[in-house]
Amino acid sequence: MVDVYNELGLNYDPNFEEQRNLIDVYLRIYFPKIRPEEFISILDFLNESASDAKKGIEKNKIRTVYDTIKNNLILENEPMRDIEITKKKYEKEYVKLFKENYVTQSFIRAYLLDRGKKIDLFRIFDNFILNENYPFIQYQPPDGTPRSRYNEKYLLENERKEIIMKWFENTPWGISFKVRVSDKSDYKYMAINLSDNGRIDYKIQWKEEDMQTVDDIDKTYSFVKDLIRKINRENERFGIKLKIPSDDQFKFAFINTIQKFELPDNFAINHNDLSEFSRYFFPYVALVIEPRKRQSKTKTTERDERSKFGTYLRYKRVSKYDNKTKIEHRIVFFMRNYEYNDQSLSNEISKEFNITEEQALEEINAVRERYPNIKKSRKVLKKLENIPKYKPPGIGVDIQGKTRNNYKMRIAGARDRAQLNRIITFMNILIYLYAETYLYKRPDRQRMKDLLQKLTKIARRRNKVDEIVNHETPIKSVKQMTNIDRKRLTSKTEDDQNQWTRDCQNSGEDKKRRPQQFLNVEELQKLGYVWNPKLGDINFGHYERKIMVDSNGRTDSNKKKSEVVLRAVMLPLDDSGNNYVYYTCGPEENGKHMYIGFLKSKNPYGEAKPCCFIKDQLYSKNNDKRNLFLKSIGLIQNDESEVNKIVGDQLYILQSSNKIQEGRFAFLPKYLDIFLNAMLNNERVIKNHYLVSTTTGYYFKYGTKQDEYRYLNAVGSVLDLSIEDLRNKLSSSLTKDKNQLLFTSLNNGDIRAQFGSMESYLTYINTNKYLEYPLLNDLICSPGVINKYGLNIIIFQRKIRIIRKSFEREKIREHYYIVCQNHENIEDLIDPDRETILIVKEGKNYYPIILVKKEDENTKEVSITKTFQYNSNPENIVSHIFKYYEVNCQQEFKLLIKEKSNSNLNAKETNKILISLGIKEYVPKYQMIDARFKCRYLITNAGYIIPVIPSGIVKNVNIISTVNNYLKDYTTTQKYLTDLSKLTKNKLKIKPIGVFYKDKRQKSYVISAIMTEGYDAVPIIERSMTSEYIKKEKLLTQGRPNDEDIDRDISRGKSSIVVDKRVYEVSKNKYETETYQLFRYHLSYFLNNTTEGGKFKKEIENIINSEDINKRERKLELKNVLYRMTNADLSKTFNQLISRLNKQFGGQDNVSDQSENQSENQSLESETSPIVRELNPLTQANSPISIIQEPDTIQIIPEDFVPGRRNNLRESFVNTDVDEFDYSEQINPLDEPFDYATNKEPMAESVPFPKNEKTWLSIMPDSKIIDYPSYILKNNREYCYINKNKDACNINKHCAWNNSKNLCLFNVKRIQLIDFINQVTEELIQNELRASEILRRGEYFVSNIVDYNVFTERPGERIVMASNSNLEKILSELFGKENIPRIGKKRYKFDNTQTYEQLNFDNPLKETSIWYIQNIIDNNNTVFRAFANTYYWLVHPYDEVSMRNIGYYSPLQTTLSNIYKSQVINWLLQQENQDMIQKISSYIRYNKVEDFVTKLSMDVNTISSGIVELCILSILYETIIYVNDEYFNVIYVLHPTQGIVYDYKKSKNKFTNEKYQSYKKVIDIRFRYSSNSNYPDYIDALYPKKNN
């Protein structure tokens, strides 16, 4: 603490201005409690010439402070003396009262590095190899995007994934290791965190029953030490060795303990007395008062005199406890930064410091009085609701327990063992003195009590006694409860399932069903719960209490009472075995509903939900309720064999809802009921919700189990199969599929492409908990899997659309549409042999639709039909659905996007047509599939290749992977294609119309395929074809790559890459770029870590810092030093050249730069011409190093020697992207702890490079050939020096073994070294950052990592980055779509959906008497977006308005606009459209079509009048487009065949549409101009109401 007297000094006499400055600045910063008037008194006191009267004010204050301190010491000395005397004399007596102290929680840390050092956590994360003891590691870098690496096998085989989800969600800074600490449980893990400063932290938790003492904490150190050894072992080759801390170097952040004790002679604690007694020892503890828990005023029996709860203290003898000062500082903090009023501020202060609100108001007023002018820290203050957490001072010490057998002392927050022991000793003495004083009532202790009581009263008046009010309330709010037990009480809000808050809700004053929630046993014991090892006759330990209640559940009435036993249920919060939650019910809170039990409904995790009931479920006569209770507390296992159990009366028809009990009937939703019943004239008679009769039959929803396997449960209920039966049938069918025809056909090949192998798909079916419709439906429906002829499953899916309009309430509309699972299998629906299942999907629930018949009103017998078959009867349900199903299966893409290939057929359709011909040679024999397992060609018996669109395979045709064996010549192929087109009456669009060429020459083409009228390619034997012949035959030509060859090369991987010029140049560029970086890396090591290098470093720094020589001379001197330290021959040559040049131009200041440069080049011609001949001139344009080349010479001195030709080599450096990394098992990269304080790289000490060695690199001949294409760039840069033998050294292309020195050196060509030295010289002189890296100044160093976003991949491991665009897909494969964990609580995810909704809400659909008007986002491909909106409206005539309009801005609109734009660009580039282009070119600026295409392809802004784009779209989509002005007058008309038929600028007459009224495809767009520009400022989509 700075002393103000010493700071100012004797006789300090400032003037008025200096005084004001001191008061405003100095005192406010260092002595804020000194008032301005007090400062004047201090100055008088320091002035020796001041009068005694002036000095007296400060002297009196000093005397007062001294007396206060002296009296405080006297007050504190007495209780401390009593404690110390008792400690010395009665140790045996007070120690025997207490049992062993057990640890419940502890947070421990240790430091692995010296102060000032850093760890590169990237290295540790990248090198860490996972195994069963370390299955998961997470790295949170400073950029805030967590990277998780996990053992894939472990997670896939682990069925209980809730704990794994938490691993992903919790993202601490640094690296977090999950370490297995128990062999008894697969889920017993400890999280160990490592930060970049070398601090390692971990937390351990135990239960009291584990009986772990402080000494047992030492045993956990071994897990940390083993982890450090593993890190060091994986980096041993590089000498990376983190310190393994000794046991005494592990420090506690906090320790929580629990200790039992017993009072002698059957005495019991009166907590009121103990609380009062603890006040007397105010130097040690402060009392925490809990008003809610204090004793009531009315006392009846002796038992009632004992407090029902405990004594709560805060241990004060800790550093910085000063509670009074902290309160003051906290109030000032709030006043400066937050909006507040006195009530809210006092409420917050009372909570944080555990004082009453009255005391808090007093403190606030005192602060105002002391600091009347507190300035606000900002203009806009924060809200008081969003304040940071505040930890109360002191260490919590709680004495709890109602009965003498359950007294416990809990200590929370001790900082170390010594402090813990001091607290335990004091509390032991306090309890001993309490017993002596209040229980035994010893006379000498009574005198001590009286004295302490008097001193305490004095101390209280002097504010030395803290009385703390505990405002911590028990967990009661729903939000708090659900936050603690998310597994049971919360689930993602779905329409299909009620939340726990609704299922177990309070209603009125007499129905309180929500239970109480507790997190520790002590809170239960306060309520009187005791441990009982048996539950009835079952050995099952639990807590229970006995109370007397009347028939209304009241304990305080005069009615007859009976004893009841109330139990608490203990449920695990996770699978760690450490964390539990307790639920209880009682008459005090719940009235009659005093028994804890469980609801029948479960949440998505399958966990039963606790609730309070009037009757005890354990003794219920209903076996189902009793078994539910026993299952939920873990006494009996779930019976998975229960299938489709019917609950309740089936004939009671439930209303349409999202939740239907198993086996019950419910009405279909309104529109489905109309579609399936009213439209088929089905009738039913219902009375009081009971089904009386239905002679026609009536379709209802059928309830099934929906807590897990929802889709399979729905299907199984129809087929009377259990989940296990279904799984076995699915697995069996795949196992028998030897040729993988079935597997390849599923979802048209998408299943095989997604899972890769059948084994992965089988694993998914047999182990995944979330088996849903998209991935299973095709397999279930396939013939021979479940049913001999196959199944059809039709799903009616609900879609909710929220309609929002300005100034109106939002409307919610439900729509049901038929899901089209596979548009290629539409005809399967009308196969009379197939059985059809109807299912309605609402939210995530699947419910079968069944037909119920009941002809006799007097009986309960009903006929239920669960599956249906097709026939041509119009009243047949399948026939009724089919026409709608067929329409719904029309591909949206084909409706909205016009392409020439849209008329082509898939493999199944083509196969059907070929078989129908009845000609054997045209019957398909094989089918060729591509890399995505889509069928591309059918090969007939005659070997004819028939193209099909990429589609699902034909199940009974064998698969091949290439058509090369069936290629025919051009003439033969053309003939059979023409013949087959005629035979099929042009159903197959395979008539030849052109050719695809592989290569184009001057007068000919190399033809590789024939182009059909469907623009498909039919491969042929390659041949040359002249341009003249192609023109004569009127054939279209198009260059097209061979997709089959591309797919084949991709599947082969890197081994199939053909090394051409491009591959060679890219590989060479990559090699040379990395060679230069490695040169800098080794140069930096030599300069900073060797004796000889250190000498050169001093020379370099002297040259750089010299101000006596100019920049050109500094560069020459630097080059001289660099050549001397690298190669003697080059150094000699360099000096000779400098000498010759100086002689040649010596004294001639005006010699031209050009003549000097020419002279230099001529002097080097004879020495360097062999080098030049070996250089590949093709590499110079892309070379990352600037090799300066002339026809016959190469410069050893760069051109900047001549000032007129200075060239910054750094600017010519090409920093190419890393194209290829070595992802295989690499040499473990270097973990680089970096000592920023000493400029020394710790790992460098272990590099086996002699300190006095002068040779640090070797030079290879320039003629040496390097295999560039085989070069693999490693992400981890390594010193060549670490290779200890010749074999290891020569593996690296950048290293060479020196036999004479027995050392591995960095290897470089002479020509490269010259340029490297030139470039390093530039960096040292002109680039301070790069120079600092080489010279290792401060925190700078040459990076030994190429890319920090690239990690080493290992078999069986997977890396997930939070920034990955496929993050949700990856996590859904692990946890299911319903349970995707929130990485970092979704801190890094941007929700686009909300943005789209907000944009559309702000720009709603408007309407006039004849138009609906939708404005379109401007300057964002607006013309194409407007066309997308209007065309979408046009092709969806039967949808309602809200569904037809795709809005102001949406993802679908973006996709369509991009496609339309690409089609327009493509149309403009096609030669056959030149005639039309000429007609519309006047609407293109300067008639420059090429410039227009370029600008259109690169810009999203509105860059034209929009007429050209719309005209082309009109042609492509055969649509008339009317362009209207702001007043709905037609200003342009665009016709699909005639082009621009009306332009208001060129026509004097107003447009009339009589001529085009019969045209059906018409769309309207409106242009609005806000200036004189020819380009529209705003564009709207117009929808006519007449067609609605």
Curated annotation (Swiss-Prot):
Top-level taxon in the UniProt lineage: Viruses
Polar residues composition-biased segments: 498-507
Feature: compositional bias, Low complexity: 1150-1169
Gene Ontology CC annotation, any one: virion component
Skewed-composition ranges (Basic and acidic residues): 486-495
Subcellular location: Virion
Main location: virion
Name of the protein this chain belongs to: Uncharacterized protein R327
Species annotation: Acanthamoeba polyphaga mimivirus
